[in-house]
Design a protein with these regions (language model features):
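Hinge/cleft segment of the Venus flytrap/periplasmic-binding protein
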Residues: 5, 134, 138-142, 153-154, ...
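Short, low-complexity disordered leader/linker segments with a strong preference
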Residues: 1-6, 31-32, 36, 76-86, ...
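Hydrophobic alpha-helical
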Residues: 66-82, 150, 164, 168-234
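Hydrophobic alpha-helical segments within soluble ligand-binding/sensing domains
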Residues: 7, 49, 105-131, 144-145, ...
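Flexible loop/hinge segments that line or gate small-molecule binding clefts
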Residues: 72-112, 123, 130, 136, ...
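Extracytoplasmic "Venus flytrap"
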Residues: 6-33, 37-51, 55, 59-61, ...
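Short, solvent-exposed amphipathic alpha-helices that sit
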Residues: 18-35, 113-117, 141-160, 174-179, ...
Protein backbone atom coordinates (compact mmCIF):
# COMPACT_ATOMS: atom_id res chain seq x y z
CA UNK A 1 0.00 0.00 0.00
CA UNK A 2 1.32 3.43 -0.94
CA UNK A 3 0.20 4.88 2.39
CA UNK A 4 2.60 2.51 4.15
CA UNK A 5 5.69 3.80 2.34
CA UNK A 6 8.60 4.94 4.47
CA UNK A 7 11.07 7.14 2.61
CA UNK A 8 14.43 8.46 3.80
CA UNK A 9 15.45 11.93 2.58
CA UNK A 10 19.07 13.06 2.92
CA UNK A 11 19.14 16.80 2.24
CA UNK A 12 22.35 18.80 1.72
CA UNK A 13 21.38 21.53 4.18
CA UNK A 14 19.56 24.84 4.13
CA UNK A 15 22.20 27.05 2.48
CA UNK A 16 19.74 28.94 0.26
CA UNK A 17 16.14 30.00 -0.02
CA UNK A 18 15.75 27.57 -2.91
CA UNK A 19 17.03 24.64 -0.85
CA UNK A 20 14.55 25.43 1.94
CA UNK A 21 11.71 25.58 -0.62
CA UNK A 22 12.73 22.18 -1.97
CA UNK A 23 12.74 20.63 1.50
CA UNK A 24 9.34 22.10 2.38
CA UNK A 25 7.88 20.96 -0.95
CA UNK A 26 9.09 17.36 -0.54
CA UNK A 27 7.86 17.20 3.07
CA UNK A 28 4.45 18.56 2.00
CA UNK A 29 4.18 16.05 -0.86
CA UNK A 30 5.04 13.15 1.48
CA UNK A 31 2.40 14.34 3.95
CA UNK A 32 -0.17 14.71 1.18
CA UNK A 33 0.43 11.10 0.14
CA UNK A 34 0.47 9.79 3.70
CA UNK A 35 4.11 8.66 3.51
CA UNK A 36 6.40 8.45 6.54
CA UNK A 37 9.33 10.71 5.58
CA UNK A 38 12.52 10.35 7.61
CA UNK A 39 14.46 13.59 7.10
CA UNK A 40 18.17 14.23 7.65
CA UNK A 41 19.92 17.60 7.21
CA UNK A 42 23.60 17.00 6.34
CA UNK A 43 24.73 20.59 7.02
CA UNK A 44 26.82 20.57 3.82
CA UNK A 45 28.88 17.51 4.84
CA UNK A 46 29.11 14.40 2.66
CA UNK A 47 30.03 12.22 5.64
CA UNK A 48 26.72 13.18 7.27
CA UNK A 49 24.85 12.17 4.12
CA UNK A 50 26.61 8.80 3.97
CA UNK A 51 25.74 8.19 7.65
CA UNK A 52 22.12 9.15 6.97
CA UNK A 53 21.82 6.80 3.98
CA UNK A 54 23.32 3.95 6.03
CA UNK A 55 20.84 4.71 8.81
CA UNK A 56 17.95 4.62 6.31
CA UNK A 57 19.21 1.25 4.99
CA UNK A 58 19.41 -0.11 8.56
CA UNK A 59 15.83 1.06 9.17
CA UNK A 60 14.67 -0.82 6.07
CA UNK A 61 13.02 2.14 4.33
CA UNK A 62 11.17 1.61 1.03
CA UNK A 63 13.16 4.23 -0.85
CA UNK A 64 15.80 6.92 -0.37
CA UNK A 65 15.91 10.46 -1.75
CA UNK A 66 19.48 11.81 -1.90
CA UNK A 67 20.41 15.40 -2.79
CA UNK A 68 24.19 14.84 -3.13
CA UNK A 69 26.40 17.66 -1.84
CA UNK A 70 29.24 16.69 -4.23
CA UNK A 71 29.46 14.44 -7.31
CA UNK A 72 32.07 11.91 -6.18
CA UNK A 73 32.50 9.42 -3.34
CA UNK A 74 29.07 7.73 -3.39
CA UNK A 75 29.83 4.32 -4.93
CA UNK A 76 30.17 2.35 -1.69
CA UNK A 77 27.01 3.58 0.03
CA UNK A 78 24.98 3.29 -3.20
CA UNK A 79 26.18 -0.33 -3.52
CA UNK A 80 24.99 -0.94 0.06
CA UNK A 81 21.53 0.43 -0.79
CA UNK A 82 21.40 -1.70 -3.95
CA UNK A 83 22.34 -4.83 -2.00
CA UNK A 84 19.49 -4.04 0.40
CA UNK A 85 17.19 -3.62 -2.65
CA UNK A 86 16.31 -0.06 -1.65
CA UNK A 87 15.87 2.27 -4.65
CA UNK A 88 17.78 5.56 -4.45
CA UNK A 89 16.46 8.64 -6.26
CA UNK A 90 18.95 11.48 -6.77
CA UNK A 91 17.29 14.84 -6.17
CA UNK A 92 18.28 18.04 -8.05
CA UNK A 93 21.93 16.99 -8.51
CA UNK A 94 23.89 14.13 -10.03
CA UNK A 95 26.70 11.83 -8.97
CA UNK A 96 29.77 10.48 -10.76
CA UNK A 97 28.86 6.83 -10.25
CA UNK A 98 27.60 3.86 -12.26
CA UNK A 99 23.98 4.69 -13.13
CA UNK A 100 22.93 1.13 -12.23
CA UNK A 101 23.53 2.06 -8.57
CA UNK A 102 20.56 4.45 -8.43
CA UNK A 103 17.01 4.34 -9.75
CA UNK A 104 16.81 7.77 -11.38
CA UNK A 105 17.80 11.43 -11.12
CA UNK A 106 15.05 14.05 -10.80
CA UNK A 107 16.78 17.31 -11.70
CA UNK A 108 17.13 20.21 -14.07
CA UNK A 109 19.73 20.16 -16.81
CA UNK A 110 22.24 22.51 -15.16
CA UNK A 111 24.21 22.89 -18.41
CA UNK A 112 21.05 24.19 -20.10
CA UNK A 113 20.60 26.71 -17.26
CA UNK A 114 24.16 28.00 -17.64
CA UNK A 115 23.79 28.18 -21.42
CA UNK A 116 20.49 30.07 -21.12
CA UNK A 117 22.10 32.63 -18.77
CA UNK A 118 25.00 33.12 -21.21
CA UNK A 119 22.70 33.40 -24.24
CA UNK A 120 20.65 36.09 -22.51
CA UNK A 121 23.83 37.98 -21.55
CA UNK A 122 25.30 37.72 -25.05
CA UNK A 123 22.12 39.17 -26.55
CA UNK A 124 21.93 41.90 -23.91
CA UNK A 125 25.55 43.03 -24.41
CA UNK A 126 25.93 42.36 -28.16
CA UNK A 127 28.59 39.80 -27.27
CA UNK A 128 30.91 42.28 -25.52
CA UNK A 129 31.23 41.81 -21.75
CA UNK A 130 33.76 41.35 -18.96
CA UNK A 131 32.09 38.92 -16.56
CA UNK A 132 32.67 38.07 -12.91
CA UNK A 133 31.35 34.66 -11.87
CA UNK A 134 30.16 33.43 -8.49
CA UNK A 135 30.41 29.65 -8.60
CA UNK A 136 28.42 27.26 -6.44
CA UNK A 137 29.85 24.77 -3.95
CA UNK A 138 33.15 23.31 -5.17
CA UNK A 139 32.66 19.82 -6.60
CA UNK A 140 28.86 20.01 -6.85
CA UNK A 141 27.25 18.95 -10.12
CA UNK A 142 25.23 22.19 -10.15
CA UNK A 143 28.39 24.33 -10.07
CA UNK A 144 30.34 22.18 -12.53
CA UNK A 145 27.54 21.94 -15.10
CA UNK A 146 26.28 25.53 -14.85
CA UNK A 147 29.82 26.72 -15.53
CA UNK A 148 30.24 24.26 -18.41
CA UNK A 149 26.96 25.39 -19.99
CA UNK A 150 27.77 29.09 -19.57
CA UNK A 151 31.30 28.68 -20.96
CA UNK A 152 30.00 26.69 -23.97
CA UNK A 153 28.07 29.76 -25.14
CA UNK A 154 30.51 32.56 -24.34
CA UNK A 155 33.32 30.65 -26.07
CA UNK A 156 31.57 31.67 -29.32
CA UNK A 157 32.02 35.36 -28.46
CA UNK A 158 35.67 36.57 -28.49
CA UNK A 159 34.74 39.74 -26.57
CA UNK A 160 32.95 37.92 -23.73
CA UNK A 161 35.45 37.03 -21.02
CA UNK A 162 35.22 35.77 -17.45
CA UNK A 163 37.77 37.99 -15.69
CA UNK A 164 37.16 36.71 -12.13
CA UNK A 165 35.62 33.43 -10.93
CA UNK A 166 35.37 32.08 -7.41
CA UNK A 167 33.04 29.94 -5.28
CA UNK A 168 30.57 31.67 -3.00
CA UNK A 169 29.32 28.27 -1.77
CA UNK A 170 25.72 28.98 -2.85
CA UNK A 171 25.21 31.30 0.17
CA UNK A 172 24.26 34.97 0.43
CA UNK A 173 27.16 35.63 2.81
CA UNK A 174 29.58 33.88 0.43
CA UNK A 175 28.30 35.88 -2.53
CA UNK A 176 28.72 39.17 -0.67
CA UNK A 177 32.24 38.37 0.52
CA UNK A 178 33.50 37.23 -2.89
CA UNK A 179 31.86 40.15 -4.73
CA UNK A 180 33.57 42.55 -2.32
CA UNK A 181 36.91 40.97 -3.26
CA UNK A 182 36.08 41.19 -7.00
CA UNK A 183 35.23 44.90 -6.72
CA UNK A 184 38.41 45.54 -4.74
CA UNK A 185 40.59 43.64 -7.22
CA UNK A 186 39.05 45.42 -10.22
CA UNK A 187 39.05 48.89 -8.63
CA UNK A 188 35.26 49.08 -8.61
CA UNK A 189 32.80 48.48 -11.44
CA UNK A 190 34.55 50.19 -14.36
CA UNK A 191 36.03 46.96 -15.78
CA UNK A 192 33.05 44.71 -14.92
CA UNK A 193 30.10 44.47 -17.30
CA UNK A 194 28.13 41.66 -15.64
CA UNK A 195 27.84 39.21 -12.77
CA UNK A 196 26.84 35.60 -13.44
CA UNK A 197 25.93 33.88 -10.16
CA UNK A 198 25.26 30.14 -9.99
CA UNK A 199 22.34 30.86 -7.66
CA UNK A 200 20.13 33.76 -6.60
CA UNK A 201 21.29 33.82 -2.99
CA UNK A 202 24.88 34.56 -4.03
CA UNK A 203 23.56 37.20 -6.44
CA UNK A 204 21.58 38.82 -3.61
CA UNK A 205 24.71 38.93 -1.46
CA UNK A 206 26.67 40.40 -4.37
CA UNK A 207 23.98 43.07 -4.93
CA UNK A 208 24.43 44.13 -1.30
CA UNK A 209 28.22 44.30 -1.78
CA UNK A 210 27.74 46.47 -4.88
CA UNK A 211 25.41 48.88 -3.11
CA UNK A 212 27.78 49.19 -0.14
CA UNK A 213 30.60 50.00 -2.59
CA UNK A 214 28.54 52.68 -4.33
CA UNK A 215 28.02 50.51 -7.42
CA UNK A 216 24.55 50.44 -9.00
CA UNK A 217 23.42 46.88 -9.78
CA UNK A 218 21.82 46.56 -13.27
CA UNK A 219 23.13 50.01 -14.26
CA UNK A 220 26.86 49.64 -13.55
CA UNK A 221 26.89 45.82 -13.49
CA UNK A 222 24.28 43.49 -15.03
CA UNK A 223 23.10 40.66 -12.74
CA UNK A 224 21.96 37.23 -14.00
CA UNK A 225 21.50 34.21 -11.74
CA UNK A 226 19.66 30.90 -11.33
CA UNK A 227 16.91 29.54 -9.01
CA UNK A 228 14.00 32.05 -9.17
CA UNK A 229 13.62 32.44 -5.38
CA UNK A 230 11.13 35.08 -4.17
CA UNK A 231 13.82 37.59 -3.09
CA UNK A 232 15.35 37.78 -6.58
CA UNK A 233 11.95 38.77 -8.01
CA UNK A 234 11.80 41.55 -5.42
CA UNK A 235 15.32 42.63 -6.47
CA UNK A 236 14.26 42.62 -10.15
CA UNK A 237 11.11 44.61 -9.35
CA UNK A 238 13.32 47.10 -7.47
CA UNK A 239 15.68 47.43 -10.47
CA UNK A 240 18.57 45.59 -8.80
CA UNK A 241 18.70 42.34 -10.84
CA UNK A 242 18.24 41.63 -14.55
CA UNK A 243 17.34 37.97 -15.02
CA UNK A 244 16.87 34.67 -13.22
CA UNK A 245 16.35 31.13 -14.50
CA UNK A 246 13.92 28.98 -12.56
CA UNK A 247 15.15 25.84 -10.85
CA UNK A 248 12.01 23.86 -10.04
CA UNK A 249 11.98 22.92 -6.31
CA UNK A 250 8.87 20.69 -6.56
CA UNK A 251 10.68 17.40 -7.12
CA UNK A 252 8.95 15.20 -4.53
CA UNK A 253 6.06 14.14 -6.77
CA UNK A 254 8.16 12.74 -9.62
CA UNK A 255 10.64 11.21 -7.14
CA UNK A 256 7.93 9.37 -5.20
CA UNK A 257 6.25 8.31 -8.47
CA UNK A 258 9.55 6.78 -9.62
CA UNK A 259 9.83 4.72 -6.42
CA UNK A 260 6.22 3.51 -6.84
CA UNK A 261 6.88 2.61 -10.48
CA UNK A 262 9.98 0.61 -9.53
CA UNK A 263 7.98 -1.31 -6.92
CA UNK A 264 5.55 -2.30 -9.66
CA UNK A 265 8.42 -3.43 -11.86
CA UNK A 266 7.89 -0.61 -14.35
CA UNK A 267 10.75 0.97 -16.31
CA UNK A 268 11.94 4.33 -14.95
CA UNK A 269 13.94 6.82 -17.05
CA UNK A 270 17.44 7.47 -15.68
CA UNK A 271 16.90 11.23 -15.80
CA UNK A 272 13.56 12.90 -15.16
CA UNK A 273 14.14 16.51 -16.27
CA UNK A 274 12.54 19.48 -14.51
CA UNK A 275 13.80 22.64 -16.25
CA UNK A 276 12.23 26.08 -15.77
CA UNK A 277 12.08 29.32 -17.81
CA UNK A 278 14.06 32.58 -17.75
CA UNK A 279 12.33 35.48 -15.98
CA UNK A 280 12.93 39.19 -16.61
CA UNK A 281 11.95 42.33 -14.65
CA UNK A 282 8.72 42.90 -16.60
CA UNK A 283 6.95 40.09 -14.70
CA UNK A 284 8.98 40.33 -11.48
CA UNK A 285 6.46 42.20 -9.30
CA UNK A 286 3.66 39.77 -10.20
CA UNK A 287 5.92 36.73 -9.64
CA UNK A 288 7.06 38.08 -6.27
CA UNK A 289 3.44 38.56 -5.18
CA UNK A 290 2.71 34.92 -6.13
CA UNK A 291 5.79 33.42 -4.49
CA UNK A 292 6.55 35.40 -1.34
Amino acid sequence: MAADLTIGFSQIGSESGWRTSETESIKAEAERRGYDLKFSDAQQKQENQIKAVRSFIAQGVDGILLAPVVETGWDQVLKEAKRARIPVVLIDRGVAADSSLYLTKVASDFKEEGALAASWLAAKTNGRCNIVELQGSVGSSAAIDRKTGFDSIISNFPNMTIIRSQSGSFTRAGGKEVMESFLKAEGGAKNICALFAHNDDMALGAILAMKEAGVKPTKDILVVSIDAVPDIFKAMADGEANATIELNPHLGGPAFDAILASQKGEKVDKWIKANGPLYLPDTAAAEYAKRK
